[in-house]
Amino acid sequence: VGLPTCWDEWFPEVARNYGLRGADLLCYPTAIGSEPDHPQFNTRPLWQSVIVGHAIANGLFIAVPNRTGMEGLIQFYGGSFIADPFGRILAEAPENEEVALVAEIDLAHRQDWLQLFPFFATRRPDTYGKLTDPVTNHRQSDGHGLMGPIPGISAE
């Protein structure tokens, strides 16, 4: 079992490292919600897709408890879920509701996945050089990313 937290869920290297070290299940305790600077932008589908992608790419079961409620300007949207290595959502909480999720996890499905998708054995570490370069600040002082504002999203 691996226990990375919150922000780690956005980085594929974290899930890959746990998968390579033999974890069958990751649990990402999370506090994610609305974006006060972009109130019309819903991050929930992106958040869930990224994590489900980690499950698929690394043959992992992933449980993601997310908080609910309001704190300051942020509305935490809940939507906790459990995914399997094939990208299926095994259990999912409604948005903005606190619930206990339960799902049956058959670890043999991970072994099936490892045989079907030999991603670990066919990796290309010789192409990963940039992954170990020092981190630099990619955020511009105007609050936009390197490529400017998010298309279709206004900061107002």
Question: What does each model-found stretch correspond to?
Answer:
Residues C6-L101:
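CN hydrolase (nitrilase-like) catalytic-core segments centered on the catalytic cysteine
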Residues F61-E156:
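C-terminal beta-strand edge segments of enzyme domains
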